[in-house]
Amino acid sequence: MGTKSHFEETKAAVIDIPPAYNYIAVFLTFACNYRCSYCINYFEEEKFQKKTITGKEWTRALNRIKSRPDLPLTLQGGEPTLHKDFYEIVNGIRRDLGIDLLTNLQFDVNEFMKNVSPDRMKRKSPYASIRVSYHAEQMDPDEMIEKVLVLQKNGYSIGIWGVLHPASDGQVRDVAKKALAKGIDFRFKEFLGFYKGKLYGTYRYPDSLTMKNADRCMCKTTELIIGTEGSVYRCHHDLYQGFEPVGDIKDAAFRIEDIFRPCAVYGFCNPCDVKLKTNRFQKFGHTSVEIVK
C-alpha cells in the first residue's frame, strides 16, 4: 500500500492557486520590534486582528496549498520571526513549497542559521528570498549590514530593500551605497501614503486613495492574503481594517474563488493594493487588484 498524501491524511481540499495569482502573503503575526511612523499596516486606523494561531495550525493549513516553483509562500507581518513557533512553521512547510521571508532582521542570526538551512529559502528568482526592510528612523544600518553579510557568506539568499520616505530619502541612499560597496543587493521601495498632506506613490487607480467619499466597485485580487488567524481577505485594506474575511485557510472546504467581488469603500483603498509595481518576475506595470467601477 502506498503512502498517503498530506491531503488524504487531513481530508482537506487542496488549495489550488489560480494561474493569474502573483503573490501568497502569510501574515504570521502583526507584532513588531519597531513602530515606524509611516508603517503601511497603520495607513488608516489600527483595526486588524492581533490574534495568532499555532505553528501546527499554520503548517496544517499551508500544506494544503498547491503552488508553482515561481510562487512561494511569503512569511511576513509585523515581524514574522516574532511568532513563537516561527522555526516550527518554516521547517513544517512541505519542501516543494518555496518560502520567502520579509523581515527587519532583528533576530539572533546564529539561532536562525542553526534552525533554517540556506536552501530552505532559496530559489531561482530575480530577487532575494530573504528580503530585509531597512527603516532609517528605527534601524542601525551598520548592524544590519553586518548581519546581512554573515547570512550572505553562509549561503543565504538575502538582500535589503530601503523605503524612500521623504524625510529619510538621502540617508537611505547613503546606506545603499555602503551596502552595494560590500556586495549586498540593495534596492529601493517607493514610500506609499501621505506625508505632510501629499500622497506619495505611483498608482493605477489614483482616485481610490482620496480618503473622502466611499464609492462602489467590483474588485478582483491576484494575491492570496492570509491573516494572522488564518482568515483570507479580499485585499490589504480588508486585512488591516478588520473587514469580514472571504474564507479561512483552516476550513477544510476552503477553496480560492478567482472572481470579482463587490466593494463599497472605493476611495479608501490601501496603497499596497492599488500601487503600480513589479510582479514576481520583476516586470513593472503590475497591480495587486483589478477594479471595475
Residue spans for each PLM region:
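A short, N-terminal amphipathic alpha-helix
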Residues: 60-68
